[in-house]
Amino acid sequence: MISVREATVDDVDAVREIGLTTWPVAYDGLVSPEFIADGLAQWWSPEVVERGITRGITLVAVVDERVVGMVGLGQEAGFWVMWKLYVLPGYQGQGVGKALLDGAIGALPVGTDQLLLDVLVGNEQAIRFYRKNGFGAPRSTPDRDLGDELIWMARAL
């Protein structure tokens, strides 16, 4: 059974394990090994993970008392953005990602009208998952150019 709960600082190591395990697999062949190494150092350090837990919304999925997935949300220019949603490879395809997404939407403030995310061009597995779960082209986005590597997706709420 999958349970989703708010992350605490006691989950920093488990959340980092998810990032350090999933990033190399998720982005292999899509970006350079240097990009992966830089991203792991920049976005999955203990300090950054703890800051996400204490200042944003971070939820974890638990199966058999093990943290197996995480989702992180924050605000940018008044928009709610899902910055991270990762599930350990051995638990993918079992509803963990959907449970995390549902939990994330439920954790947003009342009145939030859309949830944004950015996704790497070519990450077809992620794009399929998000489309299957109601994401498409956004109505509006923060005034930030994502370049050619990322695209915005949104789900109306």
Segments and roles (model prediction):
Residues 30, 94-95, 147:
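Non-catalytic, surface-exposed connector residues within folded enzymatic/regulatory domains
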Residues 2-3:
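Extreme N-terminal starter segment of soluble prokaryotic enzymes
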Residues 66, 84-102, 120-128, 132-133:
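Conserved glycine-rich acetyl-CoA-binding loop
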